[in-house]
């Protein structure tokens, strides 16, 4: 980003009442990413200073808001978004609607449940019937457009549960997950009418849960801190980790996961340290790494899938974009467009042809051992 652009964004932020200085506004290629979401071609990036809106087609930061240490963000448009701000022993939940921002918290009486009800607020999610959900320390909350309803669930043997993951299936079932102070997980189905959670016994109960989503077949996928990831079909869990037969990559030496998600082609992705891992359903392999010799401690913090792309948030080098078709990783920066258009998965030749293609989309008949290829829309590893 050039200096004039940065200065203009700074004054715009100050004019809107955000106390900020140039030094406090970190560009998209250097920021500490906490969460991401997408609207059209605009990527919304939550950081420890506020949030950025980056146009991925043009390759330009459209807006910067220095509103504090964000933990979570969701958006329907540039003028309709939610974010949570961590204040230490409390949080605020903020709704931007048009030119107005409404703040909800225990301090202003909007969030009920006592002094801890908004601590560590995160996991913002849109639910059925235009509801908004978030989790906190010992509580999770639902907004129906007018007011918040807070739900208190039983504490574990090690204290309150910090709820941070929500997922919704096609039947409207609410799946919730979190961890207590000793990183013991809870996972289960929640009935918002009765206000009751039905816990599901799982073998990751002694681990932390950090991500969760529901696929098109209503399977629930859960990412854990150190036991790999799980697929739950409503009755049975299947675990995938570094010791699974599906792991054919010697570089996957840990079962830690971050940011479990699913790409448009059906592949599952997660991260550990600086590596992005792809699980095709048959195999696990490192799809790429985020490396920068000037930032040896950099690590992937979150993932966000968008069409054929996986956006990768990091702790020190901002956002990177992985193209699931070409296998290329590009660091986002002003002046670097990364999304030209979202490909229709039904018209991409690599997804409809019996021919074999490499990850760059080139047709090939000479298959090399140890490489990944595409045929009929499915990636496979040539042993």
Indicate residue ranges for each PLM-predicted region:
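Structural motif
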Residues: 89-94, 182-188, 228-230, 277, ...
């Amino acid at each position: 980003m050039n200096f004039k652009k940065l200065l203009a964004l700074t004054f715009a932020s100050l004019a809107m009442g955000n106390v900020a200085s140039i030094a406090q506004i970190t560009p998209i290629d250097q920021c500490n990413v906490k969460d991401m979401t997408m609207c059209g071609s605009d990527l919304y990036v939550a950081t420890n200073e506020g949030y950025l809106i980056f146009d991925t087609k043009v390759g330009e930061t459209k807006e910067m808001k220095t509103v504090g240490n964000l933990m979570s963000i969701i958006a329907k448009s540039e003028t309709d978004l939610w974010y949570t701000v961590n204040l230490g022993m409390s949080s605020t939940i903020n709704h931007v609607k048009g030119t107005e921002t409404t703040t909800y918290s225990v301090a202003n009486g909007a969030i009920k449940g006592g002094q801890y009800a908004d601590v560590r607020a995160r996991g913002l999610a849109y639910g059925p019937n235009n509801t908004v959900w978030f989790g906190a320390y010992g509580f999770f909350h639902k907004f129906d457009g007018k007011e918040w309803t807070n739900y208190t669930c039983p504490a574990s043997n090690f204290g309150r549960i910090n709820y941070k993951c929500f997922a919704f299936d096609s039947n409207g079932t609410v799946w919730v997950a979190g961890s207590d102070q000793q990183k013991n997980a809870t996972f289960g189905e929640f009935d918002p009418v009765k206000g009751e959670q039905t816990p599901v016994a799982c073998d990751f109960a002694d681990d932390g849960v950090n991500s969760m989503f529901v696929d098109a077949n209503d399977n629930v996928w859960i990412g854990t801190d150190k036991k790999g990831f799980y697929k739950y079909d409503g009755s049975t869990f299947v675990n995938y980790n570094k010791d699974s037969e599906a792991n054919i990559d010697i570089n996957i030496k840990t079962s830690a996961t971050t940011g479990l998600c699913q790409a448009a082609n059906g592949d599952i992705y997660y991260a550990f340290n600086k590596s992005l891992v792809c699980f095709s359903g048959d195999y696990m392999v490192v799809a790429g790494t985020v490396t920068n010799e000037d930032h040896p401690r950099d690590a992937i913090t979150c993932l966000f899938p968008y069409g054929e792309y996986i956006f990768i948030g990091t702790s020190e080098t901002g956002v990177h974009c992985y193209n699931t078709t070409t296998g290329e990783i590009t660091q986002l920066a002003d002046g670097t467009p990364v999304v030209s258009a979202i490909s229709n998965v039904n018209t991409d030749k690599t997804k409809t042809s019996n021919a074999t293609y490499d990850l760059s989309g080139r047709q090939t008949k000479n298959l090399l051992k140890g490489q990944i290829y595409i045929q009929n829309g499915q990636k496979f590893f040539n042993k």
